[in-house]
Amino acid sequence: DAVADHDHIVAVIKGTFVNNDGSRKAGFAAPSVFGQEECMRSVLAVSEVGEDEVGYYEAHGTATELGDAIEARMLKNVYGSRPLKIGSVKSNIGHTNMAAGVANVIKTALMLENRTFVPTINHSEPADELKTPGCAITVCTKTEEWKSDSQRIAVCGAVGMGGANAMAVLGEYVEDIQRGEEEAKPYLFIYSGASKEAAKKISEDVAAYVTENDVRFDDAAYTL
């Protein structure tokens, strides 16, 4: 529907999954490695995405000694020695409480659209679980190009009080450039100016541009 409506597509939601730690957590407010790992493996399965296809994980990342250690252990269990960038928007904007998961999704979608890793600020040292030999999970600490030979894919994670885990797999939107022939019909070009003279100048500039360049009139009419 978004493609048909010519909407601006930032990223594609490939799948989501929600579960609860149940009795496997240490306490009501404490997360669980088992629950988070189950959620991660399940969201990858429903999204039909392999662990080696994921390039980034947006962590719940509350910067607590217990929570970060559990999340790091979950990532190590699932991704092993596979390269993976991780980060948390909480370092940039703080904890947005009920909107924390949405903030993760917005940040990650923009990263996919711009094909860029952005830094998690004020990070100095990774969790002990990520320091083990062979672990290739690293925290993003600087802005850098997200290089990939295939579709860029990321996972967003969020944890709720009482043992709730929620994850979403987001994919880069790859536009289908195969298009049909331009329909031979009149197209409406809409523009305005602060005066008649300004409007006339814009009209002349547009006419000159479409004459001198290979322009599809349907595209031009849609964006003007």
Regions inferred by a protein language model and the residue ranges of each:
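Hydrophobic side chains in well-ordered alpha-helices
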Residues: 199-202
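Short hydrophobic/aromatic beta-strand micro-patches
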Residues: 192
